[in-house]
Amino acid sequence: MLYPDVTFEEFARSIGVSLRAGLVAAFGPEAGIDAAAEALAYGWEHWARVGQMENPSGYLYRVGQTAARRARRPQGFLPIPPVDDLPDFEPRLLPALEALSEAQRVCVVMVHALGWGQTEVARLLDISPSTVRTHLARALTHLQRELEVNDHAD
């Protein structure tokens, strides 16, 4: 989608939350928020060029990925929260999510945890909806196997 007559501020208001959500899903809260800020700063600085791109939000997502990877710490992407702050959930879930590929993790978190549509996720990641479906299917198969979840619970 071209944004030739849209100011950067209008564009950022329309995609800022999506961009941040995708990068947080990929890299965790701290690195994802920082990466989104860097991506938006890059977009603001280069808006004359970025605004003419076919998918500027997808491009800025890639800018954010690069920023997050440069800053990535050696430990896992999810910080270990204090036990008292956690809702009840399967304790093996976080390690199982970390074991997914970045694309699979982003698709699962955005679709199943944040309630996004597959088309919205595809647009943000600059991939086809069928690729999102493939990532979801593979990720869910992996998670079911790791968490020993049966599709047909009695």
Feature map (PLM): residue ranges:
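A short, charge-rich alpha-helical start-of-domain segment used by transcription regulators
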Residues: 1-21
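Conserved RNAP core-binding helix
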Residues: 12, 20, 29-46
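C-terminal flanking helix
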Residues: 16, 20, 24, 40, ...
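Short amphipathic alpha-helical boundary/capping segments
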Residues: 23-26, 92-100
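Arg/Lys-rich amphipathic alpha helix in sigma70-family domain 2
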Residues: 45-52, 62-81
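DNA-recognition helix of helix-turn-helix
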Residues: 65, 125-154
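Internal acidic/polar
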Residues: 70, 74-97, 117, 152
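A short pre-motif secondary-structure segment
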Residues: 107-111
